[in-house]
């Protein structure tokens, strides 16, 4: 019960922090958040918890804020800025994976106490690392495209929820499928893999629903650097 209520609070706090970054630092704040969230989500993902009867990773909340941030960039600054943010996030993830694999290659001192912990967090199996990278770049690029397509058809501010929720729901479906297929398909029995796929997507979808009120707040928000210019 604690996990369920705290997870909702945890998710709300995440989106409030994104808005604070946007308010305080404008467009640059969203770019910084996307880089930070990409790293942080891949640290959190190693911890699994029970949520609403499902086994899930904590990284899904932080990962969901990346879609939220790119949607805000798309809505207020256009798809070109959103795509730039996607490539920033992908480059950050790729660099993190490469650099930390190098760190693990160093032989630890006899007095070292961190190697085992680092291996737990960063010792990705090749399939998991590949699945994460492929899922990120494909789903984030798709999110920008779908958001822009929905906006062309439904440009009204009242339908911001449709643009935000629709693009995220579609792109996260592909994100979940690509990651779980590359990382786990063939390793686990088909029924276990299907359970992982469904439970992961449901958690991500719940995060996208929580984000909707904050999308309207971001739409109305004028960052400090734009107010003074």
Curated annotation (Swiss-Prot):
A cellular component term, taken from the record's GO annotations: plasma membrane
Entry keywords, A to Z: Cell membrane, Membrane, Transmembrane, Transmembrane helix, Transport
Compartment(s) where it occurs, according to its Swiss-Prot or TrEMBL record: Cell membrane
GO terms classed as biological process: pyrimidine-containing compound transmembrane transport; queuosine salvage
Main location: membrane
Name of the protein: Probable queuosine precursor transporter
GO MF annotation list: transmembrane transporter activity
Gene encoding the protein: ypdP
The keyword Transmembrane helix belongs to this UniProt entry's keyword annotation: yes
Coiled coil (UniProt feature): none
NCBIfam families: queuosine precursor transporter (TIGR00697)
Domain of life the protein comes from: Bacteria
Transmembrane segments: 6-26, 28-48, 49-69, 86-106, 118-138, 160-182, 192-214
């Amino acid at each position: 019960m604690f996990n369920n209520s705290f997870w909702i609070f945890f998710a709300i706090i995440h989106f409030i922090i994104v808005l604070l970054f946007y308010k305080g630092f404008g467009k640059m704040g969203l770019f910084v958040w996307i880089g930070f969230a990409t790293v942080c989500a891949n640290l959190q993902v190693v911890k699994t918890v029970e949520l609403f009867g499902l086994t899930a990773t904590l990284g899904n909340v932080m990962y969901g804020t990346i879609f939220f941030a790119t949607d805000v960039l798309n809505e207020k600054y256009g798809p070109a800025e959103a795509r730039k943010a996607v490539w920033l996030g992908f480059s950050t993830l790729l660099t993190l994976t490469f650099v930390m694999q190098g760190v693990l290659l160093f032989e630890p001192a006899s007095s070292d106490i961190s190697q085992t912990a680092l291996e737990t967090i960063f010792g990705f199996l090749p399939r998991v690392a590949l699945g994460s990278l492929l899922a990120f770049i494909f789903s984030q690029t798709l999110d920008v495209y779908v958001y822009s397509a929905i906006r062309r058809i439904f440009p009204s501010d009242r339908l911001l929820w449709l643009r935000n929720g629709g693009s995220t729901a579609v792109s996260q479906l592909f994100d979940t499928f690509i990651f779980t297929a590359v990382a786990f398909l063939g390793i686990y029995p088909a029924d276990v893999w299907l359970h992982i796929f469904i439970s992961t997507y449901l958690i991500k979808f719940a995060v996208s629903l929580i984000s909707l009120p904050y999308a309207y707040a971001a739409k109305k928000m004028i960052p400090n650097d734009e107010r003074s210019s």
